[in-house]
Amino acid sequence: MVLSNVDAEEVNMDSSMELEESSQEPLRADNYEEIYNSLVHHEPDLEEAAHASYSWVVKNFSTLEDKTYSPLFKAGHTTWRIVLFPKGCNQTEYASVFLEYLPQCKVEAIRKYEAELAAGKTPTIDPEIVNDETYSCCAQFALSLSNVQDPTVMQINTSHHRFRSEVKDWGFTRFVDLRKIAVPTPEFPVPFLENDEICISVTVRVLQDPTGVLWHSFVNYNSKKETGYVGLKNQGATCYMNSLLQSLFFTNIFRKTVYKIPTDNDDSRDSVAYALQRVFYNLEKQREPVSTTELTRSFGWNSFDSFMQHDIQEFNRVLQDNLEKKMKGTEVENALNDIFVGKMKSYVKCIDVNYESSRVEDFWDIQLNVKGMDTLEDSFRDAIQVETLTGDNKYYAEGHGLQDAHKGIIFESLPNVLQLQLKRFDYDMLRDMMVKINDRHEFPLEIDLEPYLSETADKSESHVYVLHGVLVHGGDLHGGHYYALIKPEKDSNWFKFDDDRVTRATIKEVLEDNYGGEPAGRAKGYNGNPFKRFMNAYMLVYFRKSRLDHILSPVTAEDVPFHVRNTLDEEHRVVERKLLEREEQQIYRRVRVLTTDGFKKYHGFDMTDFSASDDDPVLITTKIKRNANIWDLQKHLAGLLNRDTSGIRIWLMTNRQNRTVRVDLPLDKKTILVDQICDMHIRKDMDMRVYVEFLSEHNQLLADFGATDDNDFDTYIFLKIFDYETQQISGLADLHVSKNSPISSLSEWIREHLKWSSDVPITYYEEIKTGMVDVLDPNASFEKSEIQVGDIICFEKKLVHDSSSDTSHPYKSALDLYDFMAHRVVITFEPRYSDDTNNGVFDLVLTTHTNYTDMARAVANKLNVDPNYLQFTMAHLPSRTPRSVIRNPSKFTLQNAIPSTYSHNQNVVMFYEVLDITLSELERKQLIRVHFLSNGISHETQMEFYVDKEGTVEDILRQVTQKVPLNAEDASRLRLYEVYNHRILKSHLPTDGIYDLNEFSTAYVEVTPKEEQMQLKTDDAVSIVVQHFFKDLSRLHDIPFYFVLLRGETLKDLKKRLQKRLGYNDTQFSKVKLAVLQAQSFGKPYYLTDDDEVLYGELEPQSHILGLDHPPANGSAQYHGMDQAIRMK
């Protein structure tokens, strides 16, 4: 026997599969049972529909044609045949063998073909061209070649495939070497091919495909068509966010609540609620995966943020907090609490005396242990287990002293939507590191949670919960992939939402595949893909069964805010139009048409702005078939313009080297094709741009100039006029002139046409390009002035009086207006901080010459504020994020804010702030940012304010007392210290100057603990720095702080005070190892293990630091404190 998994051009072989021999006897080609069992062993989890084996004895092998078919055979309700290429397929060195699945229509065609041949008739059908475009069939199979007389002389290859109309057969191009097929080998004394005959056998295992995607290539897969749902695009590392968003989207009551948040006047660039509404509506209506870029931009994230994976629980809370703030004062205030919030009671109850201390708190989700817990029920029992406090851990009960007590938590109420966070990441004490817990942890489709409620909880309604969402993580602590399994409706199937792809899912995929650990019932010796062990559930979403109809009530069009629906429907229509246009571009050429009438309506530079939208009144946008000729184009345009075809002339407009677009040549050859003209003169992807000259008006102009026909004229020009009163430049006429005539020859016609007196002086300019306009000599000829076809001449009535004092007319001549147009820039002004709700986003048209004073005055007029209170910050483009404050207003012009890549079609962003003090005062002030530690070191609040640059730390502390409600005694104990990279740089005295603060550090302000202040007044205490780290000193985290060492205090007693200062519970503090660190070096920590050790007198505050070695609260210690928490505007 030859056992082979040959790689063929058409095949991805299952190289891990091996056929096991049950005895010492060699495997036989006719031992179908053993071959079948080996197929099952390789894919034991797949559900079988049918299986069959079949052998085909091929006779006269050497005389066969290039392609030969076996008789048909059945496997259950499916029909198959073997396809043999005896001389090879796409090569000549190997025989090729394939397995083909036959849809019923093809089976019937083959039967009919064979019947007609048997009856001596000419076949009326070729069965090989008959096909069914809709079928698919999944199967494992083993194909073997063997000697007809000796089945042990064999070669066997195995594979699997999704048979479909695009790839109807599958097998092996290089099955057996034709040079060796008919000769004995060292392994086999007889050849495969003997007496010109050979046996080909197949065992096929037809498999169920309940999800429709088994072994799917996903080429041209359409989630909307196959499942009715669409996915979300991954921006780089946003799969964790996508899985949560899909879960929230299918929590219908949440989606309805989000839709009720008022966002009529919001901008999706900075409103999370509005951006989320848009994402949700797109998920309802789009046929393609939905982008989340707009949503993350509303968070204030840039592309770098989108490539960082975050904790899903933290992201969920930050998102909900943001929405809650937006809901305040609206009809949906507290609506999220009604959906997600339950109550739990933490208690300590004395055993021997009647005393209980308890606190009832809201929870948004429940964190449950996985390690050591076989089932979800075990995790709930673990969560509410009672801890007994005895011995050294007795509880101090006020009025009763130290008492034995029971400590624990119990649930008072559970929410309608219950989000369970499975603690898949935890600290491993033995390995001394954070690890992912891949233990098997089973969860049910339905669970009764009433046993975990307190005795006083309301149990009048059932607390049975139904599983509706499983969020899955695959990978380890350092990264991986996330997706969601969701049941969208009460009685629907389950679906897998994997970023932009949505597929149907089985119950096994929902439950068994995500329990983690080794799957139950795994066959002994199975050597399949071990990565599955690392794919497991990390968040479960249960809906209260009695409230299912409420939670999943259908979302209707009326639930969607009108402005969201209207705006996005229009955006979708625009997208559809663009798709249609792209399709039409293969047949049609878009044509932008400028006429004399349009030219007269235009007031900018050049002939017109061809980047304008299709509804621009200056231009006409139409289309013409690419194979149409110029005469067809002329008839088409004449009809659009309601003119006779003989009354118009078409001119092609092209790009000049100076980046202007001008009339170039007349399209007089009527038989030439539109595409031929375009290929010769314009770029392939560019619209065809034409100017339509009205000949009736042209003939009148000829008469006005005393000419008889066109031969008297050889230059075609365009006239513009600058009107001093309206402060506009406008198109006036298109003229044919003689190149030998002087420029002044235009004057008589102009005066007559505009009814000016004959003595009005006229000044002429040539509009060459942006920023270049030349004065023309009226006595020079058109030829000498280098005026050619398509050139633009602008003229004006020369002012005869001094207009310098006329402020209502800033442009004194055409040159002034041309200069403005050349340096014109649109600035988009945005509030520097998103919480500035009093002011909005607006555009102003200014010039690159605009200085700071003029810009401030223009913005102040718009905002109705004093310009002296405005401060501006330039922006990064294209991210539209703040870059740097304008520090030197006296030297600033808008040119400083314009990037070199700026084009006149884009807006430049500038951020503004309305200050509480004037800008001049601000120059004497310094912005101070501090973090106030309000509850020990466990809570911090960031605040900002200005203080005098010459001020002191006392000024900072005074500002803090104005922002935080403190009594006089606490205010007197405030202290400020600086931290950099989680190390204390310096503790400041109130008299220290502001200039002493390091601009790169973080300033922390706290109320010095009263007992610490009292202790330090004695000789029995010393203050020392405490610093957090994880395993080594390059991995610092959390906020360092000051702590007091007491004379004679043992390490055991110190730990109790330290735990209280940190605010850690027993579980958290059990992970902390105390160590002595060298203050001025990165030497190895000296770990403290003797509880009787006394640190006072052993540690010097200037030389030592008390180190706390433990994993950070967020589960990911970063080097040098570079970890970034999730932030949203």
Curated annotation (Swiss-Prot):
InterPro entries: MATH/TRAF_dom, Papain-like_cys_pep_sf, Peptidase_C19, Peptidase_C19_UCH, TRAF-like, USP7_ICP0-binding_dom, USP_C, USP_CS. It comes from the Eukaryota. It catalyses: Thiol-dependent hydrolysis of ester, thioester, amide, peptide and isopeptide bonds formed by the C-terminal Gly of ubiquitin (a 76-residue protein attached to proteins as an intracellular targeting signal). Residues 7-23 have a biased composition (Acidic residues). Residues 51-204 form the MATH domain. SMART domains: MATH (SM00061). Its EC number is 3.4.19.12. It is an enzyme of class 3 (hydrolase). One of its GO terms (cellular component) is cytosol. GO terms for biological process: mitotic DNA replication maintenance of fidelity; negative regulation of error-prone translesion synthesis; protein deubiquitination; proteolysis; regulation of protein stability. It holds the Pfam family USP7_C2. Transmembrane segments: none annotated. Disruption phenotype: Decreases cleavage of the sde2 propeptide; simultaneous knockout of ubp5 abolishes cleavage. Simultaneous knockout of ubp5 leads to abnormal splicing of introns featuring long spacing between the branchpoint and 3'-splice site. Simultaneous knockout of ubp5 leads to a growth defect and thermal stress sensitivity. SUPFAM superfamilies: Cysteine proteinases, TRAF domain-like. Belongs to the peptidase C19 family. This is Ubiquitin carboxyl-terminal hydrolase 15. It comes from Schizosaccharomyces pombe (strain 972 / ATCC 24843). The lineage of its organism: Eukaryota, Fungi, Dikarya, Ascomycota, Taphrinomycotina. The gene is ubp15.
